[in-house]
Amino acid sequence: MKASLLNKLDTLQDRFEELTALLGDAEVISDQTRFRAYSREYAEVEPVIACYVGWRKVQDDLEGAQALLKDADPDLREMAVEEVREAKEQLVGLESQLQRMLLPKDPNDGRNVFLEIRAGTGGDEAAIFSGDLFRMYSRYAEKRGWRLEILSENEGEHGGYKEIIARVEGDSVYGKLKFESGAHRVQRVPETESQGRIHTSACTVAVLPEPDEQVAIEINPADLRVDTYRASGAGGQHVNKTDSAIRITHLPTGIVVECQEERSQHKNRARAMSWLSAKLNDMQTSAAQNAIASERKLLVGSGDRSERIRTYNYPQGRVTDHRINLTLYSLDDILAGGVDAVIEPLLAEYQADQLAALGD
């Protein structure tokens, strides 16, 4: 194992011993805030230290077996050869596990998200494809037991959406969807195409982590223009009777968010403010993330909204993710919610990039 990793593990072990002592301290126990914080840190560190202790034991076993290779007894030497082989195999597995455990964790991975899908080039066909993408993510959310609620929608003239915004709530939503941001391209023959020519259209997807109250950006009310209007939608006794829909404009940046799905103006405003906070937070963090990704050439993690990340080719039944040169001939399954077929290889590639950087 590299000396840099050993140093990190030794430092972590010192911290683990310190945490063990702190959690037994009466003063800490009486302070629930500190006790909870130390308990969370202990729970994160303990599995790493357990693995490290196991690695050191196997390392000691290896050194003992290697010493027996010089023994005069041929039976002992033969036994030692097998023990050396087994110990080396175990060390490879334990080192790999420790490296993964030491990877920096994205603090946003456990968060809910705002999912934004917008039609780009391609007119009506792009709007229809936006609808296809939204159904794909909706089915994926359903498979994972997530809750999806539409915040705002602007339907296309011939189906689909010019724009649709949804909030997705559940376990590790951002951790799964964070690499879906970018330009998604579709190649297919539109229903209105009489000569069977393949058209190319595109949509952009943005996945924004929903900030919690502790990290939400403080927004000056003087920087906001708030407009109310009547929500549109299917008929019913509540439609068009109150100005429940909310449009908020952040004047310094020009960002506009709308929410019209709730019947309560108060709920729509709360959702819109949370979404605005997510967009402002994304503006602050994306530039830094892009700089890091460029420096380390982590194409998977750049999150550039203009970057073409994936092509859906209907005639060939093909989905290609251009960031990792992944091609799958399972278009129907993926559009039916089987997005893990693309997401899991992306996450694996990102982890491999992180491991490579860890060893630098």
Curated annotation (Swiss-Prot):
Belongs to the prokaryotic/mitochondrial release factor family. GO terms for cellular component: cytoplasm. It comes from the Bacteria. This is Peptide chain release factor 1. It comes from Pseudomonas entomophila (strain L48). Peptide chain release factor 1 directs the termination of translation in response to the peptide chain termination codons UAG and UAA. Methylated by PrmC. Methylation increases the termination efficiency of RF1. Pfam families: PCRF, RF-1. Signal peptide: none annotated. GO terms for molecular function: translation release factor activity, codon specific. Keywords: Cytoplasm, Methylation, Protein biosynthesis. It is found in: Cytoplasm. The modification N5-methylglutamine is found at Q237.
